[in-house]
Amino acid sequence: MMIAGIDEAGKGPVIGPMCIGGVKIEESRAHILKVLGVADSKKLTPKKREQLAAQIKKHADGFFVLEVSPSQIDELRKIMTMNEIMVVCFSKVLEQLKPDLLYADAADVNAERFATNIRKQYSKTNPDHAKEIEIISMHQADATYPVVSAASIIAKVRRDELIEELKKEWGLDFGSGYPSDPKTKEFLLNWGKEHSGEFPEIVRQSWQTVENIREELKKTGNKN
């Protein structure tokens, strides 16, 4: 039986893309992932993640990373919620892997609903397989199922690569891109002041953080 895991990296940041990773492996060989030492990607150092990502790709029967740019996220948010966007993205990765059993890290407060919605979305493109596939969704699935940990790792490594590329391309150091990062907040505030509340394409314009900065600049009359 072919099993797969899907997880995201970069759902919350205000800067940079979101990556959704998927890893597929024959269930009888899935113990290899445990032997490799995959764990929740957030608990690993960037170097260890990179090493593991290479090993995962070598041993997996299939893998795929979907990249969603800030502008794509902004456009989608005009017509759907973030939860609905996650369903569409997970389904797109599922289309590439087509396992017999999917373990998905729940991107919804209701894990069961998330699984149901993935099946519904997936049935639009793969109606027959959508009836057969077993989908198990749970919170922190990356800490329970090694195949989800593996998906989390390849997603995180790809997002980190893209963030570094953006920093080089723009000649900027905006920190991690997460709203809670002081360096990210400082970058956004300074950029907003210098560009009359307009932000570059690497920023998710629909994020509350950006709205807050725009409001703040309006109140202060955009003074440097």
From Swiss-Prot:
Which EC numbers characterise this protein's activity in its record?
3.1.26.4
* GO CC annotations, alphabetized: cytoplasm; ribonuclease H2 complex
An example molecular function term from Gene Ontology annotations: manganese ion binding
Question: Where would I find the RNase H type-2 domain in this sequence?
Answer: 1-219
Locations listed in the record: Cytoplasm
- Could you say which cofactors this protein requires? Mn(2+); Mg(2+)
Q: What is its main location?
A: cytoplasm
Which biological processes are named by the entry's GO terms?
DNA replication, removal of RNA primer; mismatch repair
Catalytic activities:
Endonucleolytic cleavage to 5'-phosphomonoester
Q: What class of enzyme is it?
A: hydrolase
Positions annotated to bind a divalent metal cation: D7, E8, D105
Q: Which Gene3D superfamilies match?
A: Ribonuclease H-like superfamily/Ribonuclease H, Ribonuclease hii. Domain 2
Task: Give the disulfide map.
Answer: none
The UniProt keyword set, sorted, is: Cytoplasm, Endonuclease, Hydrolase, Manganese, Metal-binding, Nuclease
Q: How is the cofactor bound?
A: Manganese or magnesium. Binds 1 divalent metal ion per monomer in the absence of substrate. May bind a second metal ion after substrate binding.
Q: What's the stated role of this polypeptide?
A: Endonuclease that specifically degrades the RNA of RNA-DNA hybrids.
Homology family? Belongs to the RNase HII family.
Can you say what this protein is called?
Ribonuclease HII
Source species taxonomy: Archaea, Methanobacteriati, Methanobacteriota, Stenosarchaea group, Methanomicrobia
Gene that produces this protein: rnhB
